[in-house]
Amino acid sequence: MIPGEIITPAGEIELNVGRPTIKLQVSNTGDRPIQVGSHYHFYEVNTALNFDREQARGMRLDIPAGTAVRFEPGDEKEIILVPLVGTRQVYGFNAKINGNL
């Protein structure tokens, strides 16, 4: 073993296996790029992103932890969301929930 070496089991790591997902079309109507991180409550993202917000309540991007999706001005893309898990309490972000989902 080399100091700091990480030994992982063989095979692929599957994220969010068995969790329900939804697909949404999202467009950036603003004049600046918007980047959304993997665990940001998607319901509370920048208001320049246009999509069905109610469907995104309690959801986050279905992407690896620590990564993000970037929306350039005028961009429209389909994203996949998964439910936030754990206590299903959301605090901070844009203060639209600040409590139980």
UniProtKB/Swiss-Prot annotation:
Gene: ureB
Assembly and binders: Heterotrimer of UreA (gamma), UreB (beta) and UreC (alpha) subunits. Three heterotrimers associate to form the active enzyme.
Highest taxon of the lineage: Bacteria
Keywords, in A-Z order: Cytoplasm, Hydrolase
Class of the enzyme per the UniProt entry, highest EC level: hydrolase
Cellular component annotations (GO), alphabetically ordered: urease complex
Catalysed reaction, written as an equation: urea + 2 H2O + H(+) = hydrogencarbonate + 2 NH4(+)
Alphabetized HAMAP family for the sequence: Urease_beta
Name this protein carries in UniProt: Urease subunit beta
NCBIfam families the record matches: PRK13203.1, urease_beta
EC number per UniProt: 3.5.1.5
Pathway: Nitrogen metabolism; urea degradation; CO(2) and NH(3) from urea (urease route): step 1/1
Any one Gene Ontology molecular-function term assigned to this protein's record: urease activity
GO biological process: urea catabolic process
This protein's record includes keyword Nucleotide-binding: no
Signal peptide: none
Natural source organism: Nostoc punctiforme (strain ATCC 29133 / PCC 73102)
Family classification: Belongs to the urease beta subunit family.
Location(s), subcellular: Cytoplasm
